[in-house]
């Protein structure tokens, strides 16, 4: 791996960018907790308050682990966000359960989630990089 300052800066910036959505969603959830709970009620999850709190924790803690990569454990944050992102497909974007045009809209969201997972996998691979 290249051992340059530019590479390190790019790596740090990429960690922020790959987690940006999760930071924004987690911070929004902290300040709009009732709305997050209602989303969990809408999709029929049991214990919506617990799931809402878990969602926010996962988004913020996973992002922090990736960005700060303490002792090389950023891969745990990547894993947290990968599992979270994949679970949102059947729980929140079950495109197969809808008719058109909503089916296509939800399918596109699911594809975007798969793309995010690819970025998170790369962040897990780079978690072991040391300057």
In which residue ranges do the predicted regions lie?
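Extended, low-polarity transmembrane helix blocks
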Residues: 1-32, 49-61, 68-131
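Membrane-interface interhelical connector segments
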Residues: 31-46
